[in-house]
């Protein structure tokens, strides 16, 4: 069981957690890992010309994620932080986790948890963190009907889970994640809108291992090609530099400049 503490810094709340560490052995992930709910997926894909979201929106979400790092203090291995912005009738919730996301993913309790609200198995450690963050947010903030959730790395993991819960509560939800790990063994094809940015050599999106899987519309920030098929990256070409939120932001800004110059 996780033990959570609360602290307040620089206008955003930090959840400090001591989560049970487990060894990610293949045997631990077998057994009751199949989902009781498999959502239909259309499997659409395309190029930047048919990208189903404006690049300016992706840049804005990346800027929010970058700002929560710049404005906040260094987080410990099992700490998560969030910030809430109210903007013209839309609630924007930004999440972040610790800087060493890859190590923390392997430390968290990775056993699948049968989430009855979603009728699906989700990552137990991410769910524990998301539960505490959701309770904090609901207790301290009035939420609009339209909610955008965004997060980088482990922040993207809790953004997904909380977004799915809020969508189940009839909120109008959109989720934007950058370099997030997988959170479920299910395919939430017809659930909340989720735009998932993942650089091809980033390490954290490759975790945790099968049977966990990604869901949503995967976007390659470098080419702006997109797909609902969520192909896995290559373990042999991992580059830790590709995981920085600043890397995502710099790449997306270049697309924004190119579009303004070409008028597209």
State the predicted function of each range.
Residues 33-150, 154-264:
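Non-catalytic, mobile gating and regulatory segments of ester bond hydrolases
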Residues 19-30:
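Bacterial N-terminal signal peptides
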Residues 1-3, 145:
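N-terminal leader/targeting segments
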Residues 5-19:
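Bacterial N-terminal signal peptides that target proteins for export
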């Amino acid at each position: 069981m996780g033990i959570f503490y609360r602290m307040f810094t620089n206008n955003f709340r930090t959840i400090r957690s001591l989560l049970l560490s487990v060894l990610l052995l293949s045997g631990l992930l077998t057994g009751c890992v199949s989902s009781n709910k498999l959502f239909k997926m259309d499997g659409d894909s395309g190029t930047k010309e048919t990208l189903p979201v404006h690049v300016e929106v992706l840049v804005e979400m990346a800027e929010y994620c970058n700002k929560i790092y710049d404005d906040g203090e260094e987080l410990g291995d099992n700490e998560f932080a969030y910030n809430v912005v109210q903007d013209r009738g839309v609630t924007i919730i930004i999440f972040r986790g610790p800087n060493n996301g890859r190590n923390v993913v392997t430390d968290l309790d990775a056993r699948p948890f049968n989430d009855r609200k979603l009728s699906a198995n989700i990552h137990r450690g991410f769910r524990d963190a998301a539960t505490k963050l959701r309770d904090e947010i609901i207790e301290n903030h009035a939420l609009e009907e339209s909610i955008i959730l965004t997060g980088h790395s482990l922040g993207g993991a809790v953004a997904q889970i909380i977004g799915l819960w809020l969508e189940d509560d009839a909120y109008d939800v959109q989720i934007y994640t950058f370099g997030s790990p997988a959170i479920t063994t299910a395919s939430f094809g017809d659930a909340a809108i989720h735009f998932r940015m993942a650089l091809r050599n980033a390490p954290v999106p490759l975790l945790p291992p099968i049977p966990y899987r990604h869901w949503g519309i995967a976007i390659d920030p470098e080419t702006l090609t997109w797909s609902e098929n969520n192909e896995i990256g290559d373990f042999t070409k991992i580059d830790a530099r590709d995981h920085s939120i600043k890397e995502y932001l710099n790449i997306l800004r270049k697309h924004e400049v190119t579009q303004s110059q070409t008028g597209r």
